């Protein structure tokens, strides 16, 4: 008897999950129009002629605020299931969550100290 016989369905799933995107990309490559003209290369801006350049430089502060937001947004995603199952998890899970929150508070204090949260 073959040892991996229980994984046949999983192997079939992997093959199909790999084949479908590859076939979709190949079909697009074969059926897509090949013409390149000047009008297709223009920037599209709500059906109007673009005003100004396409490349706008943003202040790096926007990226710092976005990065700090993403970090604490992910924290919320991790803490929500813990909060829902708080009564069933026990003291050890509570201590682990406190350690996790402490690490994030230290990260926030570090970002604040480095001036990542100041706009000046």
UniProtKB/Swiss-Prot annotation:
Keyword check for Membrane: yes
Localization of this protein: Plastid, Organellar chromatophore thylakoid membrane
Gene Ontology terms: cellular component: NADH dehydrogenase complex; organellar chromatophore thylakoid membrane; plasma membrane; plastid
Keywords: Membrane, NAD, NADP, Organellar chromatophore, Plastid, Plastoquinone, Quinone, Thylakoid, Translocase, Transmembrane, Transmembrane helix, Transport
GO molecular function, one term: NADH:ubiquinone reductase (non-electrogenic) activity
Entry-linked InterPro entries: NAD(P)H_OxRDtase_bac/plastid (IPR023043), NADH_UbQ/plastoQ_OxRdtase_su3 (IPR000440), NDAH_ubi_oxred_su3_sf (IPR038430)
Reactions mediated catalytically: a plastoquinone + NADH + (n+1) H(+)(in) = a plastoquinol + NAD(+) + n H(+)(out); a plastoquinone + NADPH + (n+1) H(+)(in) = a plastoquinol + NADP(+) + n H(+)(out)
Recorded coiled-coil stretches: none
Enzyme class: translocase
Ranges that cross the membrane: 6-26, 64-84, 89-109
EC number: 7.1.1.-
Membrane topology summary: Multi-pass membrane protein
Major site of localization recorded for this protein: plastid
Recorded superkingdom: Eukaryota
One Pfam match: Oxidored_q4
Entry annotated with the keyword Signal: no
Record-stated family: Belongs to the complex I subunit 3 family.
UniProt-listed HAMAP family: NDH1_NuoA (MF_01394)
Complex and partners: NDH is composed of at least 16 different subunits, 5 of which are encoded in the nucleus.
Protein role: NDH shuttles electrons from NAD(P)H:plastoquinone, via FMN and iron-sulfur (Fe-S) centers, to quinones in the photosynthetic chain and possibly in a chloroplast respiratory chain. The immediate electron acceptor for the enzyme in this species is believed to be plastoquinone. Couples the redox reaction to proton translocation, and thus conserves the redox energy in a proton gradient.
Protein name stated in the entry: NAD(P)H-quinone oxidoreductase subunit 3, organellar chromatophore
Organism: Paulinella chromatophora
Gene: ndhC
